[in-house]
């Protein structure tokens, strides 16, 4: 062997390099090649040679690609492939037998070549022939391999065409799939099939649900078809939606008492006044009554004890068409003669006595009315109603009744020769002066009745609200007068009610208040300040403003009064700019006040009088004020209560 190595090293065409050693394992009888450069172990020679050529070419300096080991690599690869093909296609015995025979023949040929190559000594001519033999064997092996692959593919193709074999690689056709690759491919294929089945099932369910929604219910076999022919209206019986006529009552049923009649009583008496004139007086109560016409005011109503019977004759012809009105039609009314009253109720009256007593009564009435209707200093005097003095020729007796001492007003019918108009006598008792206010309350109503003027119904709630609003206006006007700004509530107050000296004093107070109010810009400019001030800070500023105003102007105003003044000034200033476009059209007093408050912005805020809350919107402010309205307030400690029970309990516990 040493001679052979010396021959190879001595020749110029062969250069040898020691790249590794052979390592033997005694436990499992395995041989491995040890690399000197990277100290790795390789179990096969082709792998070791490929490792040297790829990783250590810079040290070994390979000049060309060596194919000495290519045949051995192919043979070793063919053996591995034969084992894999035998395992994958074990069901086909014929293909396995043929492949094993071919592999055995190739192995024999290779063994023979290896034995020949191992003989000693080897000449160059023999080496060249051996290379040619190796090339021929390699070519034949490649051809056999391709033929075997084509034959195996033809045999394994299924007839149905659904089965798909292993995918071929375009770059390396010689390498086939391993067992692990085949298993993963099979698993992936089966999973795809299962997922496709699940997908198809889901799609079928969705289609079924959609079709069930859109599908209409089939018609029943016994169902009737809709009518397509026009309806014959002549065959349909007519329907009457009117109420059937009520039976006409008999004459005995129509005999009723006068006290039980309501509206029919007025209609009957109206018809009776056109024929006969009454002679019995009528009692007038101080309670407001319903609206009376000029003809109804002349009707003489007796006491509730008088009975009147109305005989109503049936109509000659009844109307066949029914209506919603009263079923009985009144054609004729007969009134019985009135009862004769005793002579003590009716006393003779002289014209002169009537005129004297009438003058005295009117004087007392005027005096009582003057005491009640004193005009306020800061409001216009209300206009009085005009009173007509002309009397009608058909006037009758009127009785004004009070609780303890009635005042009787009797009418006396005179001839046209003695007097042109009828006069009224008022008989006063000794204690009638105490009831002058009650008589005064009904004076305007009595005058309207005498002059045929319709009375309007009076709502006590409306009167109460008007009285409360009037008192609130008076209170706000008195507060504004303390700071010299009463013209904010009414522009005509200063021009009509105040004297020139008082007007000058009011303007000085207004200027003084304006100078003080101008310092507190955080109050009147609340909406322009950013960030807005907190309610606690604003309440402190209002308290300081109240203290300064009381000290400077010598008045005693509370924080709630100052807040009310601020709100009224802001609202008035806003209304001036929104209601009047041309400032020349407003009055002189309003123009002066507007000039004094020229520093105020148009936007403002509402300050609650009862708490420290501040509001920008008027609706929210009014809604908040309702929460402060209470019905019960203690006069001693000024506490408010929502319910009467709480108020009484407070009085028992806190103020025994």
From Swiss-Prot:
Organism per entry: Drosophila sechellia
Alphabetized InterPro entries for the sequence: Znf_C2H2_type (IPR013087)
Protein name, UniProt field? Protein teflon
Q: Which family does it belong to?
A: Belongs to the Teflon family.
Q: What does this protein do?
A: Specifically required in males for proper segregation of autosomal bivalents at meiosis I. Expression is required in the male germ line prior to spermatocyte stage S4. May have a role as a bridging molecule maintaining adhesion to hold autosome bivalents together via heterochromatic connections.
Signal sequence extent? none
Q: What else is known?
A: Drosophilid specific gene duplication generates rgr and tef. Teflon has a function unique to Drosophilids.
Q: Where is the composition biased (Polar residues)?
A: 89-104
GO annotation (BP), single: male meiosis chromosome separation
Just give the chief location class: nucleus
Q: Does the keyword Cell cycle apply?
A: yes
Q: Which PROSITE patterns match?
A: ZINC_FINGER_C2H2_1 (PS00028), ZINC_FINGER_C2H2_2 (PS50157)
Any Gene Ontology CC annotation: autosome
Where in the cell does this protein reside? Answer: Nucleus; Chromosome
Q: Which UniProt keywords apply?
A: Cell cycle, Chromosome, Chromosome partition, Meiosis, Metal-binding, Nucleus, Repeat, Zinc, Zinc-finger
Q: Where are the zinc fingers (C2H2-type)?
A: 33-56, 606-628, 632-655
What ranges does the record give for the region Disordered, renumbered to this chain? 80-131
State if Repeat is listed as a keyword.
yes
Q: Which Gene Ontology terms cover its molecular function?
A: zinc ion binding
Q: What is the lineage of its organism?
A: Eukaryota, Metazoa, Ecdysozoa, Arthropoda, Hexapoda
As recorded in Swiss-Prot or TrEMBL, the protein's gene is named tef
